[in-house]
UniProtKB/Swiss-Prot annotation:
<dbReference type="Pfam" id="PF01520">
    <property type="entry name" value="Amidase_3"/>
</dbReference>
<feature type="region of interest" description="Disordered">
    <location>
        <begin position="39"/>
        <end position="63"/>
    </location>
</feature>
<dbReference type="GO" id="GO:0030288">
    <property type="term" value="C:outer membrane-bounded periplasmic space"/>
</dbReference>
<dbReference type="GO" id="GO:0043093">
    <property type="term" value="P:FtsZ-dependent cytokinesis"/>
</dbReference>
<dbReference type="GO" id="GO:0071236">
    <property type="term" value="P:cellular response to antibiotic"/>
</dbReference>
<dbReference type="GO" id="GO:0071555">
    <property type="term" value="P:cell wall organization"/>
</dbReference>
<dbReference type="GO" id="GO:0008270">
    <property type="term" value="F:zinc ion binding"/>
</dbReference>
<dbReference type="InterPro" id="IPR002508">
    <property type="entry name" value="MurNAc-LAA_cat"/>
</dbReference>
<keyword id="KW-0378">Hydrolase</keyword>
<dbReference type="GO" id="GO:0051301">
    <property type="term" value="P:cell division"/>
</dbReference>
<feature type="domain" description="MurNAc-LAA">
    <location>
        <begin position="59"/>
        <end position="273"/>
    </location>
</feature>
<protein>
    <recommendedName>
        <fullName>N-acetylmuramoyl-L-alanine amidase AmiA</fullName>
        <ecNumber>3.5.1.28</ecNumber>
    </recommendedName>
</protein>
<keyword id="KW-0961">Cell wall biogenesis/degradation</keyword>
<keyword id="KW-0732">Signal</keyword>
<comment type="similarity">
    <text>Belongs to the N-acetylmuramoyl-L-alanine amidase 3 family.</text>
</comment>
<dbReference type="GO" id="GO:0009253">
    <property type="term" value="P:peptidoglycan catabolic process"/>
</dbReference>
<dbReference type="InterPro" id="IPR050695">
    <property type="entry name" value="N-acetylmuramoyl_amidase_3"/>
</dbReference>
Amino acid sequence: MSTFKPLKTLTSRRQVLKAGLAALTLSGMSQAIAKDELLKTSNGHSKPKAKKSGGKRVVVLDPGHGGIDTGAIGRNGSKEKHVVLAIAKNVRSILRNHGIDARLTRSGDTFIPLYDRVEIAHKHGADLFMSIHADGFTNPKAAGASVFALSNRGASSAMAKYLSERENRADEVAGKKATDKDHLLQQVLFDLVQTDTIKNSLTLGSHILKKIKPVHKLHSRNTEQAAFVVLKSPSVPSVLVETSFITNPEEERLLGTAAFRQKIATAIAEGVISYFHWFDNQKAHSKKR
């Protein structure tokens, strides 16, 4: 099988199309996203897009796992899939109250393949994508919240590597193999778009962590990076938020309370709002130059 190498000399999407990449057969999500990004994104920059309805920004919230995939399970039987859905719904309500069009990848106990979650974000024209989790670890003492962005250079820590590998196996629970259907996107679009997208994802992560810190312990003070499949969007800034470790007895107890779920959801939503304020200020500043 031949290997595609990044076409670093091609700087515009029109050039990429003329190079014949559009004629290649890409399956499912890859084809739809590739066409969208090659034709619509300019100068290789990832940015919030103008919305059709009322100019609202769109944030797609992805409650991790669902259906046959329970996610991590706490000592007392709490299931990650239920906890994160409740948190995601809280985040959605808060963002909507602030004029942001927040949508869920799932609103019930259903299984959605990882790549389909990414595709949902693109179909909704998302400005941001956030996958919400409450994962587990072999050591029940592991505790605190973390935020992750995509890395195409390897994991930033052993924990990031462990969690990404664990999350990337989610499709296998339902008998689906999570193959890299976007291999060509990684090779070509990463050169054109992904660098800025990852930078914005890291910035989004820092805003969320800053808001979580006063209300809950942080497992990592900085946005970590790893090759999470669900974060592989070429142009939509994307993060994965580990709200807590459900395998930690105390954090499992907290996750079971409506008060804590609301508290962590508020912090996450405030982080998103803070990020948009930052982005608008950056944009206004650049126009003055």
